[in-house]
C-alpha cells in the first residue's frame, strides 16, 4: 500500500513544524521551513526542467531551454482505480495526492509532446470501495470512456484481477487497449509467473523488500525469536513465506515462534494478537500490514507495552509513527524506495515542494515512486511520440529515468522497475539523521541501510507473451 496554504496548517507542538521548536536542536522552525519550501520549489523546477529537457531530447522534441508553454492538446486521461471509501480510504487518499502531484509536475513542464502537439495529463479517480468486484466495474467504465491508462496498487488481489481483465480486453478490442501501471501491488508473481506485457510495476516487490529487511536482521544479533503477523490475502501470505525463506538463508539461528494471518480491514482491536506475541517470547515481529491494519496493530502494541522490534514494509506511513510514539523509537524498522531523510539537496528540495503543495500534517506522506511513475510515463510518451498504449508500453521497456536524486530503470524482461531501496529506523525528529518527521508526529526515520539500484535486482521467471 495513502491544502495549499501554510496559514491553514495545524501544527502539533514540539514538532519540526512548530514555530517554537528550537532550531539548534536540528529541526526546522516554521519561518525557516517556509523559506526553504519556497526556495525548494524553485530548485525542484530547475531539476524537473533538466529531466524534462533530457527526455524531450531523447524523443527528438524541441530544443532545450525553450520557454515552457501550457499544453494545448486534448487531455490524456489516467484512471486511478482505488479504494477511496471504506476501511482503507486514507491509503487511497494518499495515493491520489501523490499521483496528482506527479500529474501537476508534468503539466507544469508543458505536458507530453506528441506528433500533434503538447497534451496535459488528467487524473480520473474511480472508487473501487476496496472491492475486487467494484474495481472490475470501474475498469469497464474506464474502457467505455476509452481511457488507456489504468493505475492501481493497494491490493495485489485486485491487481491480479485487473491484469487478467485487461489481458482479455486488449485481445478482444485491439482498438481500445489499456495499460496497467502498478505503484504498490507487491505480489512477486505479477512480474514472474503471472507477468503480462500490459502490466508495469513501479514498486519493489515483496521479495525485494524482504531481502533488504533481511540484510538488517542479519546483523541484528539481538533478534533470536520472530513472530510473523500478516493480512490474510495473497500479499500477506507472500510476506510470510518470504520471511521464512529469507531468515533460513540469512539467519538460520532465528526461531519463528508464530505465523498468523488476520482478516484484512476487519480487525478493530489487535490486543489479542499482541497478547499472543508477548506469550511467544518473540524479540521481533515481521509484518507486511498497511493502512489501518498497521496503525491499529502498532497502537495496540503501544497500549499493551509490547517491547519488541517491528520489521515492517510500511511502518513509516499513515499514522503509524504517531500511534507508536516513544515506544517506536529504535523499535520500528521500515523499508521503502525513498524517504524524506534520504538526504541530499535535490531530495530535500523535492520533499519541500511536496510539503508546499500539501502542507497539512496529515497529508505528509510523500511516496516518491508514484510521481516518478507519472513522470516516467510522460518520458515514454515523448519517446514514442504517441499516447497509444501499445507504443507507450514498448517505449517503457528498458527506459531509464533520473529525477536528479533517484535513478531507476524499467527491466524489459518482466516490467519490474529497478531502483534504490532504503531500510530505516524510527527515532525522534531532530536526532542525528532525522531532519524531518512524519505527519507532524515529532517522529521520523533515519537510514540504516541504503541499497543502490544494482543491489536490488531480483531474479525472474517471467516468460512474457507479447502482442
Language-model segments: which ranges?
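Beta-alpha junction/loop-to-helix N-cap segments that form part of ligand/metal-binding clefts
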Residues: 63-67, 90-97, 112-192, 202, ...
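Periplasmic-binding protein-like
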Residues: 142-156, 173-183, 227-230, 281-291, ...
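Solvent-exposed, acidic/polar segments of extracytosolic/periplasmic ligand-binding ectodomains
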Residues: 58-65, 76, 400, 404-467
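Extracytoplasmic "Venus flytrap"
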Residues: 62-102, 127-132, 155, 229-238, ...
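Signal peptide-proximal N-terminal region
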Residues: 68-73, 97-123, 248-253
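Extracellular/periplasmic periplasmic-binding protein-like sensory domains
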Residues: 196, 298-372, 381-387, 437-466
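Extracellular/periplasmic Venus flytrap/periplasmic-binding protein
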Residues: 134-137, 146, 188-189, 196-305, ...
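Short, low-complexity disordered leader/linker segments with a strong preference
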Residues: 1-77, 144, 465-467
Amino acid at each position: 500500500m495513502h491544502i495549499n496554504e501554510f496559514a491553514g496548517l495545524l501544527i502539533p507542538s514540539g514538532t519540526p513544524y512548530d514555530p517554537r521548536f528550537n532550531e539548534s536542536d536540528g529541526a526546522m522552525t516554521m519561518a525557516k521551513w517556509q523559506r526553504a519550501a519556497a526556495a525548494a520549489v524553485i530548485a525542484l523546477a530547475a531539476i524537473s526542467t533538466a529531466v524534462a529537457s533530457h527526455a524531450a531530447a531523447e524523443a527528438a522534441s524541441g530544443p532545450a531551454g525553450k520557454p515552457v508553454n501550457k499544453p494545448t492538446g486534448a487531455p490524456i486521461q489516467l484512471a486511478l482505480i482505488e479504494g477511496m471509501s471504506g476501511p482503507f480510504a486514507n491509503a487511497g487518499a494518499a495515493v491520489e495526492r501523490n499521483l496528482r502531484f506527479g500529474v501537476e509536475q508534468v503539466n507544469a513542464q508543458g505536458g507530453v509532446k506528441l506528433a500533434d502537439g503538447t497534451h496535459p495529463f488528467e487524473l480520473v479517480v474511480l472508487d473501487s470501495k476496496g472491492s475486487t468486484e467494484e474495481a472490475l466495474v470501474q475498469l469497464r467504465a474506464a474502457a467505455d470512456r476509452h481511457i488507456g491508462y489504468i493505475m492501481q496498487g493497494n491490493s495485489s488481489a485486485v491487481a491480479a484481477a485487473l491484469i487478467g481483465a485487461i489481458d482479455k480486453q486488449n485481445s478482444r478490442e485491439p482498438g481500445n487497449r489499456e495499460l496497467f501501471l502498478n505503484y504498490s501491488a507487491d505480489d512477486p508473481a505479477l512480474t514472474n509467473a503471472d507477468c503480462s506485457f500490459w502490466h508495469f510495476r513501479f514498486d519493489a516487490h515483496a521479495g525485494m523488500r524482504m531481502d533488504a529487511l533481511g540484510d538488517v536482521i542479519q546483523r541484528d544479533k539481538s533478534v533470536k525469536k520472530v513472530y510473523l503477523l500478516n493480512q490474510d490475502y495473497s500479499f500477506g501470505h507472500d510476506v510470510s513465506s518470504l520471511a521464512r525463506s529469507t531468515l533460513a538463508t540469512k539467519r538460520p539461528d532465528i526461531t519463528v515462534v508464530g505465523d498468523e494471518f488476520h482478516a484484512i480491514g476487519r480487525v478493530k482491536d489487535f490486543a489479542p494478537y499482541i497478547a499472543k506475541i508477548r506469550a511467544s517470547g518473540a524479540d521481533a515481529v515481521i509484518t507486511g500490514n498497511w493502512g489501518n491494519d498497521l496503525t491499529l496493530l502498532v497502537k495496540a502494541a503501544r497500549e499493551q507495552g509490547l517491547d519488541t522490534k517491528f520489521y515492517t514494509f510500511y511502518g513509516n506511513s499513515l499514522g503509524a509513527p504517531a500511534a507508536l510514539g516513544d515506544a517506536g523509537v529504535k523499535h520500528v524498522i521500515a523499508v521503502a524506495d525513498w524517504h524524506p531523510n534520504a538526504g541530499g539537496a535535490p531530495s530535500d528540495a523535492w520533499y519541500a515542494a511536496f510539503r508546499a503543495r500539501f502542507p497539512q500534517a496529515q497529508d505528509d506522506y510523500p511516496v516518491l515512486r508514484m510521481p516518478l511513475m507519472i513522470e516516467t510515463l510522460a518520458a515514454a510518451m515523448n519517446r514514442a511520440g504517441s499516447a497509444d498504449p501499445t507504443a507507450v508500453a514498448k517505449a517503457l521497456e528498458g527506459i531509464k529515468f533520473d529525477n536528479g536524486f533517484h535513478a531507476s530503470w524499467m527491466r524489459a524482461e518482466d516490467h519490474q522497475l529497478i531502483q534504490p531501496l532504503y531500510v530505516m529506523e524510527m527515532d525522534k525528529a531532530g536526532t542525528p539523521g532525522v531532519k524531518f518527521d512524519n505527519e507532524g508526529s515529532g517522529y521520523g526515520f533515519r537510514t540504516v541501510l541504503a541499497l543502490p539500484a544494482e543491489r536490488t535486482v531480483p531474479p525472474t521467471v517471467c516468460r512474457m507473451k507479447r502482442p
